[in-house]
Structure formats: C-alpha cells, structure tokens
C-alpha cells in the first residue's frame, strides 16, 4: 500500500462575500494586499480552493484572488438553468469590484480558462496577461457577428 501523502497549507485563504449581479459570491484571497493582483478562475466541478498549491508557491509576490463561480462552492446557487455568458458578466463585475482601473492578470483552469479567454477577446483592454490551463476551446460560431453580439450583451449588463 502506498504511503499517504500529507500536504501542509502554507497560507490559508481569507474569504469574503461580495454582491455580484444579484448573487452572493464567495471569494478567497491570499498574499499581500499591496502586491500586484492575479485572478485565479477555477474549472468545472471545482472551487477556488483548488488553487491552494499554486498559492503557496506565489503568495509572497502576488495578491491572489479566486472566486467560486455561480453554482460552485460557497457562492449562491441558482434554482434555474445556468447560462454560460453570465460567467463573463460575473467576471466583469468581479474585476470592477477588485480592480476597477487598468488591465488585470487572469489565470484560468478548464471552464475558468474558457471564461477568461472569451472575456479577454471581448475586453482586450482589461487583460494584461492571460494563462489558460487544461481547456477545450469553444466551437467557432456560425454567425460571424457573434463576438460583437456578445460584447453588446456584456455592455448592457453594466
């Protein structure tokens, strides 16, 4: 029988509840408050806690901010079907709350990478750096105007 591995968390997160688009979002934070911000966006069937290993490696140099997406972890769950574009608007509202000015750094895993990548395409002026891990790209839309339509929808959510 293999030996059990034990991991010791080097820096536990602080958590806060933030009102985002009618939901109560759970957001974890690590690192110095005056350090440059990096937003960590978790994947499907996951939570913000999944980034703890990454956090322990980066915690001295960065302020790391990781939300639980709607319907995941400790963020409000809906009693209706989820619509994927809502995640783009949620990300925009989260960025407005935590980093209202200037471009941000996004790290997305799986579903979080898809959200980050589409958001970066819709709002390139808001994204300074983008890291996308373990993701499958979305199918190209048949309608060549789809990115502009989605951008107009996102503008209307503000």
Go through each PLM region and give its residues:
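Alpha/beta-hydrolase fold catalytic core
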Residues: 1-38, 59-63, 99-102, 128, ...
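Active-site loop/oxyanion-hole signature of alpha/beta-hydrolase fold enzymes
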Residues: 18-28, 66-111, 115
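Conserved HGGG/HGGXW glycine-rich cap/lid loop of the alpha/beta-hydrolase fold
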Residues: 26-77
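Conserved acidic functional residues
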Residues: 43-46, 90, 133-134
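Active-site micro-motifs of SAM-dependent methyltransferase domains
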Residues: 46, 71, 113, 137-138
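A conserved amphipathic alpha-helix that caps or lines the catalytic cleft of carbohydrate-
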Residues: 55, 95, 119-120
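Glycine-rich, phosphate-binding/catalytic loops in enzymes
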Residues: 55-58, 81-84, 123-124, 146-150
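Flexible "cap/lid" loop of the alpha/beta hydrolase fold
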Residues: 117-122, 128-158
């Amino acid at each position: 029988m293999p030996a059990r591995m034990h991991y010791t968390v080097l820096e536990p997160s602080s958590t806060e509840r933030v009102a985002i688009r009618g939901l109560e979002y759970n957001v974890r934070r690590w690192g110095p408050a005056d350090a440059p911000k990096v937003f960590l966006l978790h994947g499907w069937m996951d939570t913000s806690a999944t980034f703890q290993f990454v956090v322990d490696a980066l915690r001295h140099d960065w302020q790391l901010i990781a939300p639980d997406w709607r319907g995941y972890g400790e963020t409000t769950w809906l009693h209706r079907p989820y619509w994927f574009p809502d995640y783009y608007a949620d990300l925009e509202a989260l960025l407005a709350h935590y980093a209202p000015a200037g471009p941000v750094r996004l790290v997305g895993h799986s579903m979080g990478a898809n959200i980050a990548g589409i958001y970066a395409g819709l709002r390139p002026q808001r994204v300074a750096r983008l890291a996308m891990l373990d993701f499958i790209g979305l199918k190209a839309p048949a309608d060549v105007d789809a990115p502009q339509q989605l951008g107009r929808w996102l503008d209307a959510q503000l």
